[in-house]
């Protein structure tokens, strides 16, 4: 069983205290091609491309132009699971997971990324900003199409080493579309979270993102390897709701 989640635009590069066996990014050649493309963009072009403020565009320009795709170590990079710090990662709280759970996560959790493609928890990453939905073409393909074959092939390879061949999709649609479901040789299971608002259940972005992190943590800490145990998730008031679920979707409501 492998979980996939989205990355986060917010990143924290404060050093971590615990020593781990860090790993290198999976798609180094593709990263070189992408970062070299991004380095062509001036500040004003980044502002328009990414629809961000002039100040943020300057920061992104600096990040990409100081990016060294041939060097990933503790001087310029940090393990991905401790670097991303958006809403999903607030739910995950990776810095409070014990060493054995982090090691387990290395084989059961993958983060999708516009720049890195697929990222394992202990892969070293440098600061960047490139959302999967960014309107940029690489080799004549939009970004998620550029990554699709590469990511799907790599996932199938990882699943060949897994006993339970289920992909738990906790990523957003923007990122999960970078996986070709038709070419994925395993079962695909979506998970959704809904809130009861005035008698109607709705998916609310900020709550759903944090819940994805909570679910990721729950699966990793409990070493869950089957769907029936996922249904037992009962954190932050969420409970499995069969009325909104089917064989390809588990929905949790509160």
Curated annotation (Swiss-Prot):
GO BP terms: response to hydroperoxide
InterPro entries linked: YaaA (IPR005583)
One GO CC annotation: cytosol
Protein family according to the UniProt entry: Belongs to the UPF0246 family.
Protein's name in the database: UPF0246 protein FTT_1693c
Organism in which the protein naturally occurs: Francisella tularensis subsp. tularensis (strain SCHU S4 / Schu 4)
Lineage: Bacteria, Pseudomonadati, Pseudomonadota, Gammaproteobacteria, Thiotrichales
């Amino acid at each position: 069983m492998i979980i996939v989640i989205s990355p986060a635009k917010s990143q924290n590069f404060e050093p971590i205290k615990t020593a781990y066996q860090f790993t290198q990014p999976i798609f180094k050649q593709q990263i070189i091609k992408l970062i070299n493309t991004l380095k062509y963009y001036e500040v004003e072009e980044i502002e328009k491309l990414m629809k961000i403020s002039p100040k943020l565009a300057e920061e992104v320009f600096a990040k990409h132009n100081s990016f060294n795709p041939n060097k990933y170590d503790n001087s310029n990079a940090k393990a991905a699971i401790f670097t991303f710090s958006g809403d999903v990662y607030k739910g995950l709280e990776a810095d409070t997971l014990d060493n054995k759970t982090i090691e387990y996560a290395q084989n059961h959790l993958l983060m999708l990324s516009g720049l890195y493609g697929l990222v394992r928890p202990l892969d070293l990453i440098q600061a960047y900003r490139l959302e999967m939905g960014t309107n940029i073409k690489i080799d004549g393909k939009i970004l998620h199409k550029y990554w699709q074959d590469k990511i799907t092939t790599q996932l199938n390879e990882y699943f060949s080493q897994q006993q339970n061949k289920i992909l738990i999709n906790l990523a957003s649609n923007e990122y999960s579309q970078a996986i070709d479901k038709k070419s994925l040789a395993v079962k695909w299971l979506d998970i959704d979270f809904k809130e009861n608002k005035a008698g109607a259940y709705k998916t609310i972005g900020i709550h759903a993102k944090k819940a994805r992190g909570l679910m990721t943590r729950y699966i990793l800490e409990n070493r869950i390897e089957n769907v029936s145990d996922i249904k037992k998730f009962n954190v932050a008031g969420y409970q499995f709701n069969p009325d909104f679920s089917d064989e390809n979707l588990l929905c949790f409501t509160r």
